[in-house]
C-alpha cells in the first residue's frame, strides 16, 4: 500500500515534529489532501497524500519527531468511514477497531492514532495503535500488562519497554533517584518544568551558535524623529486613500534607509562561507514579528524595487501570516539583512543578536521625548530614538559600522531625501 513520507522541505530542515493529525485512521483521503500538520524549526507545514484512498495506519503519533523521507502513514484502498453504519465496507481490522471503540472517546485530547481493542482474558478495553496491537500479537504480549506512556494509548515502544524492563530496572531506578534529587533540591519552592517547543529549542540553539561563532559587536546612535513624524502626520490620510487603506508606518522609512545604507556599505550585506565572503546583490530585508510561538523573521523581498506602500503592505501581510501560522518556508529563508523593533515593547536600548548567517542587524527602539541641545544657546524637547547596529566584526570594520548607522540617522532625519531617492 502507498506510504506517505515526510517531504523535502528546505536545505537546512532535516526533521520535524507532528503537531496534529488532520485525518483519523479509517478516514477518506483525497489525492493532494492534507493529512497532518508538521512543525519544523521555521514554520508549520501541511503534509499531503499523493494517493486517494483510506488512511489505514498512522506510523507516528502527535509529538513524535520524524525525519525527511520517513514513512508516517499508509494509504489503503477504499472510500473510508463516514459513520459506524458504513463500517461494512472496511477491512476486518477496521471493523474490529470500530466495534471496539469507546463511545465516549470523541474529545480532541485523545490521540487521533488510537483504537480500542477488547482484551480476550478479561474483556477490558485497551487503547492501542494498530501497529502496537499487531506487534503484541506477534510477540505474545498481553496488552493489559503494558503501561502506556502517552495519553493512555499503548504504542510499540511501550511494548518494547515492557519486554526490556527486567534488564533495565536498575538503570531506571538510578535515573529516577537522580530526577528525584534534582526536583527536591528546593522542596519548599514551587517550580514549573515543561519541555520547550521545537521552535524555541531551535531558536535557543541558533542564538547560541551566533554568539559563539561570530565576533559580534554593537554600535549605537540616536535619531531625531521630529521630521519623519511630521511628514507621516501630514501624509498618512492621503497615503491610506491612495493605497487601499495601507497605513504609513515607520518601518518603511527604516527599510528604505537600510537599503540605501546597504548600497553604500556592501560589507553589511554580506556573509562568511568558509574562507569566502559572499556579498549579496539583492536586498531582502527581514522584519521581526512577535507571535505566541516567539519571534519570527519573515523577509520582504527586493526592497530596493518596492515603494513605501508596497513595503508597508508586505510587512502587514507577513505579520498576519506569522500570527495565523501560515508563513511558508519561502517567507523565512535567504534574507540579507534584518530589522528588529524592540520599541513596540517599550525597549529604550538593546544589543540585538545577528540573524542566522547575516552580517548585521538593525535595532529600533522607543521614541522618547528628551531635551536636546540644538546649538550652544538653544535646548528643545525632541522625540528621540536610539538605534543599534550589531555586526560581525570579522566582516565589518568599526568605521563601516559607524558609517552605516550614521547614514540611517541622516536619512531618517531628512525623510524628504529618502522619498526622493525612492
Curated annotation (Swiss-Prot):
Modification type N6-lipoyllysine: residues: 42
Q: Which residues form the active site?
A: 393, 397
Cofactor notes: Binds 1 lipoyl cofactor covalently.
Q: Which intervals hold domain Peripheral subunit-binding (PSBD)?
A: 127-163
Biased composition (Low complexity) is annotated at: 164-176
Q: Which InterPro entries match?
A: 2-oxoA_DH_lipoyl-BS, 2-oxoacid_dehydrogenase, 2-oxoacid_DH_actylTfrase, Biotin_lipoyl, CAT-like_dom_sf, E3-bd_dom_sf, PSBD, Single_hybrid_motif
What's the protein called, per UniProt?
Dihydrolipoyllysine-residue succinyltransferase component of 2-oxoglutarate dehydrogenase complex
Cellular compartments per GO CC = cytosol; oxoglutarate dehydrogenase complex
Q: Name one GO biological process term.
A: tricarboxylic acid cycle
Region entry Disordered: which residue ranges? Answer: 77-185
For this protein, what reaction is catalysed? N(6)-[(R)-dihydrolipoyl]-L-lysyl-[protein] + succinyl-CoA = N(6)-[(R)-S(8)-succinyldihydrolipoyl]-L-lysyl-[protein] + CoA
Q: What is its EC number?
A: 2.3.1.61
Its keywords, alphabetically, are: Acyltransferase, Lipoyl, Transferase, Tricarboxylic acid cycle
Q: Does the keyword Zinc apply?
A: no
Q: What is the protein's known function? A: E2 component of the 2-oxoglutarate dehydrogenase (OGDH) complex which catalyzes the second step in the conversion of 2-oxoglutarate to succinyl-CoA and CO(2).
NCBIfam families, alphabetized: PRK05704.1, sucB
Mind telling me which PANTHER family this protein's record contains?
DIHYDROLIPOYLLYSINE-RESIDUE SUCCINYLTRANSFERASE COMPONENT OF 2-OXOGLUTARATE DEHYDROGENASE COMPLEX, MITOCHONDRIAL (PTHR43416:SF5), DIHYDROLIPOYLLYSINE-RESIDUE SUCCINYLTRANSFERASE COMPONENT OF 2-OXOGLUTARATE DEHYDROGENASE COMPLEX, MITOCHONDRIAL-RELATED (PTHR43416)
Provide ranges: composition bias, Basic and acidic residues: 152-163
Assembly, in brief, is: Forms a 24-polypeptide structural core with octahedral symmetry. Part of the 2-oxoglutarate dehydrogenase (OGDH) complex composed of E1 (2-oxoglutarate dehydrogenase), E2 (dihydrolipoamide succinyltransferase) and E3 (dihydrolipoamide dehydrogenase); the complex contains multiple copies of the three enzymatic components (E1, E2 and E3).
